[in-house]
Swiss-Prot record:
Belongs to the HisA/HisF family. Keywords: Amino-acid biosynthesis, Cytoplasm, Histidine biosynthesis, Isomerase. It catalyses: 1-(5-phospho-beta-D-ribosyl)-5-[(5-phospho-beta-D-ribosylamino)methylideneamino]imidazole-4-carboxamide = 5-[(5-phospho-1-deoxy-D-ribulos-1-ylimino)methylamino]-1-(5-phospho-beta-D-ribosyl)imidazole-4-carboxamide. The keyword Signal does not apply. This is 1-(5-phosphoribosyl)-5-[(5-phosphoribosylamino)methylideneamino] imidazole-4-carboxamide isomerase. It comes from Nocardia farcinica (strain IFM 10152). It is an enzyme of class 5 (isomerase). One of its GO terms (biological process) is L-histidine biosynthetic process. It comes from the Bacteria. SUPFAM superfamilies: Ribulose-phoshate binding barrel. The lineage of its organism: Bacteria, Bacillati, Actinomycetota, Actinomycetes, Mycobacteriales.
Length: 243
């Protein structure tokens, strides 16, 4: 079983951008989301991780644009950002994406999240955005600016709800090119039977090989963003290294 790579396309104000540690205002633009997503498809991606940053930060949305991008792609799409009620969830699923990633909503509205998981099963993943504070694993919500509670308590609840997949991000690592938090990934894998997608910190092929080493523990994939855009390695190189 090889590691699945999900190149990220983060969208703000209709453009593909990258952030540093999820901070609003730290965007670097990379042009059209459509072109970025199609480029990853042409380079051999089987998945694209597509994020509506404006919706995630609660400052508008790129819903129509993202629906068009999903429609043009032949590969599977994981859609994320601002999916926190029936309206945004149904709109996201209606794009034809393979699955959606719930973030803040899963923390703030447990009942709604449980219903979404029960109704849509495999098409729902939950994003666990973790910041380590004084040795405690705390979750972050609303574009990473609010506290979302203790990681292990929330994970226990989501396990009871039957969540099919988790996207785990160490917020301190995201967009920094400082390497992934392998210990966090390993600990989450030990606490769930569900597959885990790693996110944040990948800076070199070696990081992906290290994450691939956790596949037997339950890591299924890795989201890669800034390292690809910054030219640290190409997607074909990365795919070859983890096959």
């Amino acid at each position: 079983m090889s590691l699945v790579l999900l190149p990220a396309v983060d969208v703000a104000n209709g453009e593909a951008v990258r952030l540093v540690q999820g901070e609003a205002g730290s965007e670097t633009s990379y042009g059209s989301p459509r072109d970025a997503a199609l480029a990853w498809q042409e380079a051999g991606a089987e998945w694209v991780h597509l994020v509506d940053l404006d919706a995630a930060f609660g400052r508008g949305s790129n819903r129509e644009l993202l629906a068009k991008v999903v429609g043009e792609l032949d590969v599977k799409v994981e859609l994320s950002g601002g999916i926190r009620d029936d309206d945004s969830l149904e709109a996201a699923l209606a794009t034809g994406c393979a699955r959606v990633n719930l973030g803040t909503a899963a923390l703030e509205d447990p009942q709604w999240c449980a219903r979404a998981i029960a109704k849509h099963g495999e098409r729902i993943a939950v994003g666990l955005d973790v910041r380590i504070i004084d040795g405690d694993y705390r979750l972050r919500g609303r574009g990473w600016v609010s506290d979302g509670g203790d990681l292990w308590e929330v994970l226990e609840r989501l396990e009871r709800d039957g969540c099919s997949r988790y996207v785990v991000t160490d917020v301190t690592k995201d967009g920094t090119l400082t390497g992934p938090n392998l210990e966090l990934l390993s600990e989450v894998c030990a606490a769930t039977e569900a597959p885990v997608i790693a996110s944040g910190g990948v800076s070199a092929i070696e990081d992906l090989v290290a994450i691939a080493g956790l596949v037997p523990e339950g890591v299924e994939g890795a989201i890669v963003g800034k390292a690809l855009y910054a030219g640290r390695f190409t997607l074909p190189e990365a795919l070859a290294a983890v096959r």
